[in-house]
Design a protein with these regions (language model features):
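Class I S-adenosyl-L-methionine
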Residues: 1-357
Length: 357
């Protein structure tokens, strides 16, 4: 008997053997890989179906498997189940060496949003993000394909709602997804199409963006992200954009080159996400000026980055104002992460930033 397309998509999901095995080893499942609902994502649900991937940021995986980590904030502390998993899988050394935010500054790492909201309350959230991170370290190619399968599942749900999928892979880290490559066989591409109705491009050593390029071209799939990377080089903002991602540059106020990097990003046509310690309900500034003195300055209009997370829908060359969120366990070391909500010029390491109301 030949199944209809609808019946195939309702049938039990049969994943490729290596993907199914990887997920099982790390206590993961396909529906749980991506987050498709939280208060901010829901704000933009009418624009596109959002899906976001969360890993542990910076050196948080190393901290989570350190028995000597006595953090009073449980999600920032020692997670014995993660340590046991890393030991069992032979990943302890890799986990201790892992840095999920290679361009993160001290204040950014201290005040990371990984520990804001639900992520700051439940060790179970940190453990799930840790298991995903360990799976990435164990087999990057199989994990990349697992994320592709999970995202195709989200795309099918978006299509049922008459929406595009907006996929963000760096929810709480800065992994170089434009450099993560995997082999996608014609048979697997056909299986994805039969199951989810997607059109993916098979190939050897493809990125996720290359695999889903037909749907991006059709307007039904959007890859977007934030990054604190610099402008140039194989890991930089320009390389990420060229690889198929809609990028928003993240302003690092406590970086030695904060103003120069901000100027360069705006000049290259990127949006600039700027955290500001605004009280809830306070109006955002209308403009932002970044100056490096002799090297020049730029003034850009500002938009409210808390209205939705869909940065891809915002114009480029703007300041995206993000109200600072409380990160549980963050101390004074996190304060330089945000600009103060004042109209006077604020001195940074290599210039000034001025908010205008």
């Amino acid at each position: 008997m030949q199944l209809t397309a609808r019946a195939r998509r309702k049938a039990p999901l049969s994943l490729p053997f290596d993907i199914a095995g990887l997920l099982a080893r790390f206590g993961l499942d396909l529906p749980g890989l991506l987050t498709d609902s939280n208060p901010k994502l829901e704000k933009g649900a009418a624009l596109a179906r959002p899906a976001i991937l969360h890993h542990l940021p910076a050196r948080a995986l190393a901290a989570a498997i350190d028995p000597g980590n006595g953090s009073p904030v449980a999600p920032r502390g020692y997670l014995p189940e993660l340590f046991a998993l890393a030991e069992r899988e032979g990943l302890t050394a890799a986990a201790r060496a892992h840095h999920g935010c290679p361009w993160g500054t001290a204040a950014c790492i201290a005040g990371c949003l990984n520990w804001a909201g639900h992520g700051g309350l439940s060790p179970k959230v940190a453990a799930a993000r840790g298991r995903r991170t360990l799976a990435l370290l164990a087999d990057p190619a199989a994990y990349g394909r697992a994320v592709l399968w999970a995202a195709c599942r989200q795309w099918a749900a978006a299509q049922r709602d008459g929406l595009a999928l907006a996929l963000r892979l760096r929810g709480t880290d800065d992994t170089a997804w434009h450099r993560l490559r995997f082999d996608l066989s014609p048979a697997e591409a056909i299986a994805l199409g039969r199951r989810f109705g997607v059109t993916v491009a098979p190939g050897q050593a493809v990125t996720l963006a290359e695999a889903v390029a037909p749907m991006v071209a059709a307007g039904s799939w959007i890859n977007y992200d934030y990054s604190k990377a610099g402008l140039g080089g194989p890991l930089g903002l320009e390389a990420q954009r060229a690889a198929g991602w809609d990028l928003t540059a993240s302003f690092a106020a406590d970086r030695a080159t904060a103003c120069r990097d901000g100027l360069a990003a705006v000049a290259a046509g990127f949006r600039l996400a700027v955290p500001v310690a605004l009280p809830k309900g306070a109006p955002i500034p209308s403009r932002l000026t970044i100056s490096t003195g002799a090297a020049g300055f730029v003034t850009v209009p500002c938009i409210d980055g808390d209205a939705t997370d869909h940065r891809w829908a915002d114009p480029h060359g703007v300041g995206v104002i993000l109200r600072t969120k409380r990160s549980r366990g963050a101390g004074p070391a996190a304060d330089p992460f945000s600009l103060a909500p004042i109209a006077e010029p604020q001195a940074l390491a290599d210039g000034t930033a001025t908010l205008h109301w």
